[in-house]
Amino acid sequence: MGQLMYCRRIVRCVAGLSMLRYVTVFAGLFVLAACSRDAAAPEDGATPLRVRLLTGEQYLNTVASIFGEDVAASVTPPTPPLTRTDGLLASGAASVGVTSDQVSQIQQAAQFIAARVLDEEHRDFLVPCEPASDLEPDPTCAGQFLRETGRLLYRRPVEETRVAELVDVAGRAAEQAGSFYDGLALALEAILISPEVLFIVDEAEPDPDNPGRERLTGYSLASRLSYFLWNAPPDDELLQAAESGELHTREGLARAVDRMLSSSRLEDGMRAFFDDMLAFDDFNSLAKDPMVYPMVTGATLADAREQTLRTILDHLLDKERDYRDLFTTRDTWMSMPLAAVYGLPTENGWVPYTFPDDSHREGLLTHISFLAANSHSVRSSPTLRGKALRELFLCQKVPDPPPNVDFSALEEAGDVPTARERLQVHNSNPSCAGCHLITDPMGLSLENFDGAGRFRETENGVELDISGELDGIFYDDVHGLTAAMRDHPKLSACLVNRLYAYGTGGPVELRYDRDALARFTTRFAEQGHKLPELLRDLALSEAFTRVRPPESPEESVVNAAEPPQSQIASTTR
């Protein structure tokens, strides 16, 4: 057993060096690709080659898809914190890597997964063959398992030289441990800590139909499609389509995309996207003061997050309704913890619910998830709500406050009864007024809802004025705000922007992507703002499948080499 531990240390050492060196390998590949291309101008809407880390959820989904939910259930994803980039954590995955401490976490997770896969409970249905002896190496059986499992984990076929190396690792470890399955576990661990498993690596090839242009390889396209639509790795059928070349034909790609869109796994993929787009990761640390809002518990906030996701998925996927109507619909879902905050009677579990016509609730902006997440722990915040409205749904970045702002005047206004009066302080300060004028008029229209999202008509005994304005549209109440939001010209364009960035693995670059995004937005409107149609348009587009060359080989080296070692430091400080 001591010698087996020595073998494990050798495997981990080699994998650790691979983790630190892999960027050099990929950088070299990118440079060679750049040198092999002609000097044609970048393809309109095409994306750069990217190397992006699997998110924590994608890591767990990968394990679950290949080995089963029960194996994944006890795994802590060994992924570093991600920085939200242009509104998405998923885009931040293209600019983050791993530190030496995280390499250790990756190794621990791999050891746990490998041990579970090959224990007596799982080996009989996860290993496709039976060894000649449980006590000795069996190169044939080991090779079959490692070849088939490696193909799913690497998301492409495993080169035979690599299979031979892994079989050798399994054989040597089996001899030392006196166990075929212990040896196989060590070889599986070596795969699981491979950078090619932990990172989604775009690879390009010349496009024979467009000389001088490049496209994603079939396997890279399969990964892009599956993590976009399913938030999970390609299944066997999608890998077969990549291997046969079907994904590089219009008919074959359309068949694959239509199959994925009709799968129940699409709901998982879109749940992950909207959870990211709405910054619902903030709920992981969100809390309300129990003295002020005793009815709001961790379970309440978790249900608030779930309510909005259920509403979105039911509206867009199950009923295939207009995306814009999410901001005016009265249809939602309700649970008992939420009903206490909404002031409604309800049953146990989740039930569909429609707010009556005379209710002040309509659309996502009146959900507890939006109202509570964008408030302080003891009170509402028109500024936070207006900022979130613009950034989440209109893709308009609101600047942070200047570092030298004096908040003393606002603090001294504590005896002023309403938020509208308190915020007049900002409007009298030139360094504050500019930003507050683009956030507060909309946020004040939501002051009928307190910091927990409960409806109210007064604040500190004073009747609330909830009139407001959104980009030239004036209204008297929250219904006017939701209508103005539904019809805002930037609303649909923002969803297109976010989906394109999410699907292609990094933030959009308007100098390259502007025309493609405009075309997608126009088509989205022509098709009634239906999400499945938009997803299909994106996935079948040349912009999604084409690759543009870097502006210089040096740019390729920097982009490929930074994530694993340098940029992670900035995300953890």
Language-model-detected regions and their locations in the chain:
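Short, functional "switch" segments adjacent to catalytic/cofactor/reactive centers
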Residues: 91-147, 447-493, 497
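A conserved hydrophobic secondary-structure block that centers on an alpha-helix together
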Residues: 136-187, 195, 208
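Extended surface/linker regions that mediate inter-domain or inter-protein docking
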Residues: 113, 136, 140-141, 149, ...
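C-terminal motif of bacterial Sec signal peptides marking the signal peptidase cleavage site
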Residues: 32-34
